[in-house]
Amino acid sequence: MNSTLQNRNRTNLERVSTDPLDTFPRRHIGPDSQQVDKMLKSLGLSSLEELVDKAVPAGIRLKKEPDLPKASTEHKILQDLKNIASQNQIFRSYIGAGYNACIIPGVIQRNILENPGWYTAYTPYQAEISQGRLEALLNFQTMIIDLTGLEISNASLLDEGTAAAEAMFLAYSIRKNEIAKKFFVSELCHPQTIDVVVTRANPLGIEIVIGNHESVELNEDFFGVLLQYPATDGKIIDYTSFIQRAHNVGAISTVAADLLALTLLKSPGEMGADIAVGSSQRFGLPLGFGGPHAGYFATKDEFKRSMPGRLIGVSKDSQGNPGLRLSLQTREQHIRRDKATSNICTAQVLLAVISSMYAVYHGPEGLKDIATRIHKFTSILADALKSSGFTISNDTFFDTITIQAGAKAKDILNRARSERINLREYKDGRIGIALDETVNSDDIKDLFKIFEVKNTDIEKLFSNSGNISDSFKRSTSYLTHPVFQSFHTETKMLRYIRKLESRDLSLTTSMIPLGSCTMKLNATTEMYPVTWPEFGAIHPFAPSEQTKGYKIIFEQLEKWLCEITGFAGVSLQPNAGSQGEYAGLLAIRRYHESRKETHRNVCLIPISAHGTNPASAAMAGFKVVVVSCDQNGNVDLEDLKIKAEEHKNDLAALMITYPSTHGVFEESVKEICQIVHSRGGQVYMDGANMNAQVGLTSPGEIGADVCHLNLHKTFCIPHGGGGPGVGPIGVAKHLVPFLPGHVLVDNTTGNEHGAVSAAPWGSASIVLISWIYIALMGSEGLTNATRISILNANYIAKRLEKAYPVLYKGKNGFVAHECILDVRPFKKSAEIEVEDVAKRLIDYGFHAPTMSFPVPGTLMIEPTESESLEELDRFCEAMLLIHQEILDVQNGTLDKIDNPLKNSPHTAAMTTSDRWDHLYPKERAAYPAPWSRDHKFWPFVGRVDNVYGDRNLVCSCLPVESYQ
C-alpha cells in the first residue's frame, strides 16, 4: 500500500514542472488519450496520423504546420489581452451616424449576453427545442412592427446598411416596370448605408441616384427610394408628401429609422412608407467598434413573401397548443437557392433577443422616458449654442444637432479631444453632436466648456425644454402587448429570461451534432473580453489613435488567418458567412473587370452546394450554372469539364466546398481547380467545412483563389441561436486589391472598393473570440483539433453504419469531419421519415443532425473535436435505440401510425396527463434511455405543424394568457 502511494506521489512530482498548468487544448478537445486510442482501435487504426493518411489525400497535405505563435495559457492570454485593450482609449463618443452608446441593463447582460444557455444554441430549425428564443424573437418582431407602424417584421438582419440594401433588392425584385433601373438615395442617409447600398447595386445593374429628396425629379425609371429618419445631420423631416410622389411613379419607399426616435416621432408607416429598416443597437447593445448589432426590416403584409431573413410565426403543436416556428422558409436560400429573396442565413438572433428584452424591461413608458430625456438634453444644448452665436443647421431634431462652427471648428475639436469627447466632423467644417442614453448634466456642462458657452442652470431649464412639434409628434400607441407591460422589476425580468432559456436546448444541455455547422466549445475564457468596456465602448468611427488595441488584434488575426489558409490577404469586414461569400465573389468580379473581362459572368456551382452559394452568386451578378455530382458524392469531373469548356469565354468562377458537403475529401480537388483556372476562371472555396482543414491542408494549398471562413464555426465564436456570425475572406495575392473598403475609414486593405457591411471591421468586438482561440491552441493544438474532429466523425460513422448506411466515404473508406446517414429505406419499410427520427432524438435529449441536406431523407452528423467519447457513445446509443424502434414498427411490435417516433417529441404535459391513449407506455415516451432519468430535457411543445403555420401566418406576440 505504502509502495503504491509512494509511486503515485513520485509520478505527480515528475509530472509537474515550471510550465503553467492552465493549458487550453486539453480543455477544448473532448477525448483524452485513452479515449482516442479506444476509438482508433475500433477503426482498426494505430494512430491519428494513420487516420489522417487514409482520410486526407496525400496530394493536398501541408508540408509543415502553420507558423503561429506558441500556445498561450488561459490566465496569461487574458493578461496579454488586457494590455492590448489598454491601448484603446475610451472617449465619450457623440458621433452618432447610426451608432449610440446605451446603458445595458445588468440583468440582461449577465443572463443573456454572458450566458451560454443563450449564446451556444443553434438557429431554431428544430422548433420544439427552441421555443424560448423563438418567443423572444417574436417579441422583437412585435417591437419592430409597433414602432415602425408597419405590418410585418423579420427576426433581424445583419446591420442597418445591409438591411437598406435588402430593401433596395426587394423593391427591385417586385417592380412592375421592368425597365425601371434607378434607385434614389437621399444625401441625408448615413454615409456607410449609402456605401453598402452602392456596393450592392453595382453588380445588379442598378443606377443609384444620390441627391436632395426635395428637388429630385422622380419618374417611372425609378423603382425605389431610400430616406433617413431622422436625417444623418439630425433633422426631422416629414416624408409623407415625398413618399406619395414616389408612389405616384410606382416606386417603393424605404425609410431607415432610429427606433428610439420612433417612441416620440411619427412612424414610417404613418408617413406611407412601404419598408422600414434600421438598427436596434441603441436598445441595449454595446457599440463594440461596430458590432455585432441586430438590423431590422419591416414592411407591408403584401410584401411578406419577398421579405429577406428569418420570420418567426405562430403555429400549433400536436396537442393543439401554440407553437412558434420559422415561417415561410420557401423564401430562403437553403430552399430557393439562386432564386431566394436574399443570401442571408445567419442573422443576429442573440442581439435581437437582447434588444427585445431591453424593450420588455423598460416597457413603452420607460423607452419614452429615455428618449424624452435625451431630447431634452439636446434641446438645452441647442438653445445654449444658439444663444452663444452658433448656427444650428437643423431646426428640428431628436438627439442630434449639426453646428456651423466656421473658423472656430478646429479649436472646438481640439478642446473636445482634451476632454476625451468625440464629435462628428463633416468635410465642410460642420460639427455634429449626437447625444445618447448615457448623457447626464455633467456631460452637457463639458460640451458647454468645449464650445465656450456660458454655463447654464441645466436643472432649471430641463423641465421646460424639448417640445417636439405636433406635426412630427407620434400620436399612435406602441408596445401595448402585456409582455411589454409585465417585467419591469429585476426579479420578474430574471425569471422571465430564465423561463425562456429553459425551453431551449443548447450546448449546455448536450452535443449538437449538426453537419456543416461545427457546434464546438465556446470557451468561457474566449468569451470574457467581449463585454470589457475597452472593446465594447468604442465607436466604429472613432479616430484611429484611439483604437490601437483593436488594430493590434486585427493585424495579428489577419496574419494568423493568412498562415492558416495559405492566402496573402484577409478582410474581417463581412459580418456573416453569407456576406463573406458575397465579398469574395465581388473580389472575383472586380478582378475580371480590372482585366477588361466584364463578360465573365458564369459561376459554376455543384448541385450539392450550400444554398447560400447560388444565392450569393446571383446577388453578385453572376449567372449560375449547376455542375453534377457522381455516385460517390464528388464533383462529376466530366460534367465540370463540359460546363467549363462550354462557358470558357464567360467563365468567372467555380464555387466548391472542401471537404465536400457529402463529408469526404475529394481526391481530385486540385484537378478541379486546374480545370477552372485553365479556362480563365477563379476558384471560390466555401469555408463552412474548414474545421477539417486547419493544420492539415489549406485553401491556398488546394488551389483556391478566395475562401470565406466562418469564425462562428471553425474559430469558436458562438452561434448565438442564429447569429452573430463573422465571415472574413482570405484571398490570393492577385485579389488583395479587390477586398472591401469603407467610405469613412482608411481600411487595412488600402483600396477604395465599396463596403459590404455598415462597420469597417464588421462585428469587431467578437473577433476577439477567434483571436483568443488561436492564441490558446497554437499550431499544434489547432492541428490536433482537426485530427480529433475527423476521428470523432469516423467513430460515429463506424458505430452506426450497420443500422444506418453511411452514404458517402472517401477512397479508403473513411469520412472527413462529418458523415451522412441514409434514413430513406425506413420510409418504405416502416413509413418512418427523417423528421420522425429527428424529433424522436429530442426525447433522448439531443438536437437532431442536419436534416435532408445535401441529400433529401438523410441526416448529416458533425460531432466536432470538443465532444468526449462518453457523449459520442450516448448519441450513438440514442440512434441505435431509435433504430430498434424502427425495427419494432417494421415487425409489428409497434403500430405504424401510433408509435413513439410519429408522436415525438413528447412533452412533460403529455406524459403526466391522466389521459394516455397511445399503444405504447408513457415510460417509453418519456424516458427512452437510462440517462433520461438522470438529466431530462423536456421540449416545451409537441411537434409543430409547419403547414398550418404558413397557411395561417401570425408573426406578432401571442395572446395574454401565454405570458402568465
Swiss-Prot record:
Set out the biological process GO terms recorded for this chain's protein: glycine decarboxylation via glycine cleavage system
Disulphide-bridged cysteine pairs: none
Q: Which GO terms describe its molecular function?
A: glycine binding; glycine dehydrogenase (decarboxylating) activity; pyridoxal phosphate binding
Bias-annotated ranges (Polar residues): 1-10
Q: Which Pfam families match?
A: GcvP2_C, GDC-P
Gene Ontology CC annotations of this record? cytosol; glycine cleavage complex
- Provide the alphabetized UniProt keywords: Oxidoreductase, Pyridoxal phosphate
Positions bearing N6-(pyridoxal phosphate)lysine: 713
Q: Where is this region: Disordered?
A: 1-25
Catalytic activity line of the entry: N(6)-[(R)-lipoyl]-L-lysyl-[glycine-cleavage complex H protein] + glycine + H(+) = N(6)-[(R)-S(8)-aminomethyldihydrolipoyl]-L-lysyl-[glycine-cleavage complex H protein] + CO2
- Keyword match Cytoplasm: no
- Give the EC number: 1.4.4.2
User: Is-annotated flag, keyword Oxidoreductase?
Assistant: yes
Cofactor(s) for this UniProt protein? pyridoxal 5'-phosphate
Q: What does this protein do?
A: The glycine cleavage system catalyzes the degradation of glycine. The P protein binds the alpha-amino group of glycine through its pyridoxal phosphate cofactor; CO(2) is released and the remaining methylamine moiety is then transferred to the lipoamide cofactor of the H protein.
- HAMAP family per record: GcvP
Query: What's the protein name?
Result: Glycine dehydrogenase (decarboxylating)
